[in-house]
UniProtKB/Swiss-Prot annotation:
Residue span of region Disordered: 258-280
Protein name: Tobamovirus multiplication protein 2A
Ranges in the topological domain labelled Cytoplasmic: 1-13, 100-113, 184-280
Cellular compartment(s): Vacuole membrane
Keyword Cytoplasm included in the entry's annotation: no
Organism, as annotated: Arabidopsis thaliana (Mouse-ear cress)
Gene designation per UniProt: TOM2A
Disruption phenotype: Reduced efficiency of intracellular multiplication of tobamoviruses (e.g. crucifer strain TMV-Cg), characterized by a reduced amplification of TMV-related RNAs.
Keywords per UniProt: Membrane, Phosphoprotein, Transmembrane, Transmembrane helix, Vacuole
Keyword Isomerase: no
Transmembrane feature ranges: 14-34, 79-99, 114-134, 163-183
Family, similarity comment: Belongs to the tetraspanin (TM4SF) family.
GO BP terms in the entry: viral replication complex formation and maintenance
Function: Necessary for the efficient intracellular multiplication of tobamoviruses, being a component of the replication complex.
List of residues that carry Phosphoserine: 196, 233
Length: 280
């Protein structure tokens, strides 16, 4: 019990940190969106010359413009990066809420959904990392940016690659730890099936019934002393277990000191008086 409580407290703490991270991403994404709208209203639009497309340059590197070229990203909004950033924050917050609800209510279903969402998030992150690592032309797959802001961000990540690498690895390890804790808490809250007479007698439906249902018949006449069938049944856990599992009435096979009067000893025959003649 103490170990389960410790695991639940640790899982709640880590989920709280995950929720704070998600809310932070949502708040910062909203701030970026407000800045984007403000800069868009005050931006300078270049005129089209020789069939070239127009671009908008922003003061912040993350608020970069997306060229309106004829590729698969034509249908993306200009602020797709902000929407993606907010979406990741919402996903983290929803996952953390699912984990908190499952931990507080000790719901096996919520903990299972939480574990599934975590493993999906880890797989997506690993797939994205593998795509960047193995595909050397991954930069060509991104929407083109002629403002130079993407190169600025890329150079910043490359210069601080050691820090960025450990931060990314720490995030994956953190999520893997959450996944393992969720599995442990789920296993601790799973109801056990007891099938031994020495273990806790869990309340469950009585599946096995006695082979013979004894029904007391009305008796008329002079009342007599209680017989075996009229004895009250015992209500201790072992007797209840025997009646449930085997359909046995333990009052017939066990000794109860309170009913010791049932077994009346036969009166001892009087010893023969000594001094009398005995005929052989």
């Amino acid at each position: 019990m103490a170990c389960r409580g410790c695991l639940e407290c640790l899982l709640k703490l880590l989920n709280f940190l995950l929720a704070v991270a998600g809310l932070g991403m949502i708040g910062y994404g909203i701030y970026l969106f407000v800045e984007y709208k403000r800069v868009t209203d005050n931006s300078v639009t270049f005129d089209l010359t020789n069939g070239d497309q127009s671009y908008v340059s922003f003061g912040r590197p993350i608020l970069m413009a997306v060229s309106l070229s004829s590729n698969i990203f034509d249908n993306l909004p200009k602020a797709w990066f902000i929407y993606l950033f907010i979406g990741i924050g919402v996903a983290l917050f929803v996952i953390s809420c699912c984990g908190c609800v499952g931990t507080c209510s000790r719901s096996v279903c919520c903990l299972s959904c939480y574990s599934l969402l975590l493993i999906l998030l880890i797989l997506v992150e690993l797939g994205f990392a593998a795509f960047i690592f193995f595909d050397n032309s991954w930069r060509d797959e991104l929407p083109s940016d002629r403002t130079g802001n993407f190169d600025t961000i890329y150079n910043f990540l490359r210069e601080n690659w050691k820090i960025v690498r450990w931060v990314a690895l720490g995030a994956v390890v953190f999520e893997a730890l959450l996944f393992l804790l969720a599995l442990m808490v789920r296993a601790a809250n799973t109801p056990a099936e007891y099938d031994s007479d020495d273990e806790y007698l869990a309340p469950r439906q009585q599946i096995r019934q006695p082979f013979i249902n004894r029904q007391a018949a009305p008796v008329t006449g002079v009342p007599v002393a209680p017989t075996l069938d009229q004895r009250p049944s015992r209500s201790d856990p072992w007797s209840a277990r025997m009646r449930e599992k085997y359909g046995l009435d333990t009052s017939e096979f066990t000794y109860n000191p309170s009913e010791s009067h049932r077994f009346q000893q036969m009166p001892a025959q009087p010893n023969e008086e000594k001094g009398r003649c005995t005929i052989m």
